[in-house]
């Protein structure tokens, strides 16, 4: 599934009674919660538990849904956001990730 298709499908599950700011607030609270749940699964792995791959994928899917909800609230296209992110990373690390470049990022590099 492509990101644009996912975003369009995920839109059905947004509470349309909220304003754009309400939708984005809901999404950001939810995103924090889901990242915490995902973190908990990986924290247990450090304690000797095996990662439940299916559970982790479902939590990661929830993270994706909340990211899509923020984008949709403001009419932003996930494909465009993904492309912008890759372009930013390519400009920052033209030869792939380098620790030295990470330690000495240019001023204003967000």
Predicted region positions:
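Flexible "arm" and connector segments at domain edges
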Residues: 1-110
């Amino acid at each position: 599934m492509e990101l644009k298709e996912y975003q369009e499908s995920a839109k059905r599950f947004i509470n349309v009674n909220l304003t754009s700011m309400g939708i984005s607030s809901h999404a950001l609270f939810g995103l924090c919660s889901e990242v915490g749940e995902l973190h908990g699964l990986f924290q247990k792995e450090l304690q000797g538990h095996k990662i439940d791959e299916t559970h982790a994928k479902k939590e990661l899917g929830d993270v994706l849904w909340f990211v899509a909800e923020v984008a949709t609230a403001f009419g932003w296209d996930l494909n465009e956001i993904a492309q912008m992110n890759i372009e930013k990373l390519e400009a920052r690390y033209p030869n792939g990730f380098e620790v030295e470049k990470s330690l000495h990022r240019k001023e204003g590099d967000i």
